[in-house]
Design a protein with these regions (language model features):
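Primary recognition of N-terminal secretory signal peptides and signal-anchoring hydrophobic helices
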Residues: 2-209, 231, 238-250
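Glycan-recognition patch characteristic of GH18 chitinases/ENGases
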Residues: 236-346
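Glycan-binding loop/region signatures in secreted carbohydrate-active enzymes
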Residues: 238-241, 463-529, 561-562
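Substrate-binding surface in catalytic domains of secreted glycosidases
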Residues: 294-301, 345, 368-489
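SH3/SH3-like beta-barrel fold
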Residues: 101, 200, 213-217, 225
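A short macromolecule-binding patch
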Residues: 175, 219-230
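Short, acidic/polar
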Residues: 263-278, 336-352, 400-409, 521-534
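Conserved, mostly hydrophobic/aromatic
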Residues: 284, 361, 418, 459, ...
Length: 562
């Protein structure tokens, strides 16, 4: 009996031990395979001071810490930050100490702390909150108002306070959550949770890592979700939000523009002889106006007689405005609302007086220090031109990193045509080379189209070339017309050979102790350029300048520009 009892005890002990082992194993498995619910501190993730009361802003994945503020429950962002990173249209005018914003028809003025704003006709508009506030001398704009006027997508996040903004519209790879799921800091169920997302939430796909998918949430977290918890990858392009668009004035036909240089009113009389050998032109841009001082005054060589002659031939006239007077303080000019208004009023009144059809801004001395002020002038002139039915065009350099301050994308919101000057590849003072090689022209047109849109782009080509002379290592050049370059070659008893790479005839030869080089512009080089222009299907071609061309190039231009 005792033996039996002892055996039973032994069995009980063994059973208890087995159960204990099983429980411990189960607990181990539970601990090992149960996802942690621990949340990562958002301030730690974004590397922010937890005591900050500022709003972080993320724009197309770029983080800007301690940027915005919250006032009366609304997010406000610095005006300068908004203009530089989100919407260049919100401009701060130092002279009136107000924010200016232009849509397709009006310019609006917002004073700090006021629940009312006005347009340029004097009409007032009421708001439930001040669009603009001043905090310690810094101008802030209500994000809610900015978002209403910006083509973007955004979400709010908290702890820390943040706005995640998407402006770019490129196609993105995305997935959706199949169920409520955790987005974790690292790939693994023991990694802390960044954010819980709901079933159906869209997440931007970054990459696959084994059983996990790296994603970006709508509030800006980059983390990991289990691959089984999300859908297959799909392509997403955010819906375009309709912005206030300029009511463009575009011609139904391809534009063939000729710049007509005059240095005084008497020069207008040569228009008949100049155009007698230039068939196919439908726009003439005479160099009538030049800014002469920081108050916005201009020299005026305009002629109603020239306009009437052109109209009788079915040719439009776009009066050119230049900024070549280096004595003018352009920073002072463009930053002054009074000066900008003076220029606008002068040009509009002269359009009434002379009857020209458009304005061509040839402002080639804009610097980054005052480029925002220049763009505001373009906006203000655009509104005035639209009201008068005047075409507005701007002349611009080939897009490069050094001239991004011209902001062609912003210009294109307000001007009818952006003319890219696809020349001056080499210029007086540079090394010897082509004024406009074919690759240079092609790149200029393609890069402009990417920023502007083909229906608004006019490709500018040269009717001139350079004759380069190098003596004892010193290079000089002189600009000449097409025939003058040929005459120089013939006078020197030399020949030029076609260069396929640059799309031009090229000559290089010795004259005494000097080397002379010429990259020619003529029918064949113009044809190569016109083929590019036709392929890009842009709005037309502009030619600098009338009188420098061989008459035979016009049939080539007409062949492709139709």
């Amino acid at each position: 009996m005792k033996k039996s009892t002892a055996g039973k005890k032994k069995i009980v002990i063994i059973a208890a031990f087995v159960i204990l082992i099983a429980v411990m194993a189960a607990m181990f498995m539970i601990v090992r395979y149960t996802p942690t619910k621990e949340k990562m501190n958002g301030y730690t993730y974004f590397d922010l001071d937890q005591s900050t009361d500022k709003t972080m802003v993320i724009v197309d994945e770029k983080q800007y810490s301690d940027t915005g503020i919250v006032s009366d429950g609304r997010h406000y962002l610095p005006q300068e930050f908004v203009a530089d990173n989100i919407n260049a249209g919100f401009y701060y005018d130092k002279e009136s100490q107000a924010v200016l914003y232009s849509d397709s028809s009006y310019m609006y003025t917002y004073k700090s702390g006021e629940n009312v704003y006005t347009d340029d006709t004097g009409k007032t508009y009421n708001t439930d909150y001040p669009v603009v506030i001043d905090v310690d001398g810094e101008c802030f704009i209500a994000w809610e108002y900015v978002a209403e006027h910006t083509d973007c997508e955004y979400s709010y996040g908290s702890q820390p306070e943040r706005i995640n903004i998407s402006i770019e519209r490129e196609a993105r790879q995305c997935v959706t959550a199949k169920k409520k799921t955790a987005v974790r800091y690292r790939g693994g169920i023991k990694s802390p949770v960044l954010e819980n997302v709901a079933k159906g939430d869209r997440l931007e796909f970054v990459e696959d890592i084994d059983d996990w998918v790296k994603v970006i949430t709508s509030t800006g977290y980059k983390g990991y979700v289990k691959k089984t918890d999300v859908s297959d990858i799909f392509e997403y392009v955010r819906e375009e939000k309709t912005e206030e668009q300029h009511n463009y004035i575009l011609k139904d036909e391809k534009i063939t523009l000729g710049w007509f240089q005059v240095s005084g009113t008497a020069g207008n009389s040569s228009i008949d002889s100049t155009l007698s050998t230039a068939p196919g032109i439908n726009v003439v841009a005479p160099t009538w106006y030049s800014i002469t001082d920081a108050s916005g005054n201009m020299s005026d060589y305009a002629s109603a007689d020239l306009v009437n002659k052109m109209h009788q031939q079915g040719i439009d006239v776009w009066a050119l405005v230049s900024d070549f007077d280096t004595n003018v303080d352009f920073a002072e000019l463009y930053s002054s609302k009074n000066a900008r208004t003076n220029m606008v009023n002068l040009l509009i009144s002269n359009a009434d007086r002379y009857g020209f059809d458009g304005i061509n801004l040839d402002c080639e001395n804009v610097k980054s220090a005052f480029a925002k002020d220049y763009l505001q002038f373009v906006r203000e002139l655009s509104i005035a031109c639209e009201r008068k039915g005047l075409v507005l065009s701007t002349d611009n350099y080939k897009p490069e990193a050094y001239n991004t301050c011209y902001n062609l994308k912003e210009q294109s919101r307000f001007v009818d045509y952006v003319i890219v000057m696809a020349y001056d590849e080499h210029y007086a003072g540079s090394d010897a080379g082509s004024v406009a090689s074919l690759p240079f022209v092609k790149e200029a047109v393609e890069d402009t189209v990417k920023l502007v849109g083909q229906e608004h782009v006019i490709a500018g080509i040269p009717f001139y070339t350079g004759i380069w002379t190098t003596t004892s290592g010193q290079t000089t050049s002189r600009a000449v017309g097409m025939q003058a370059a040929v005459d120089q070659l013939n006078s020197d008893g030399q020949v030029a050979l076609w260069n396929e790479d640059c799309g031009q005839y090229v000559a290089s030869y010795t004259v005494g102790s000097s080397t002379r080089q010429i990259w020619f512009e003529e029918e064949k080089s113009v044809e190569a350029k016109m083929q590019v222009i036709q392929e890009e299907n842009v709005a037309g071609v502009a030619c600098w300048k009338l009188g420098l061309e061989k008459t035979t190039v016009w049939s080539v231009i007409s062949k492709y520009n139709k």
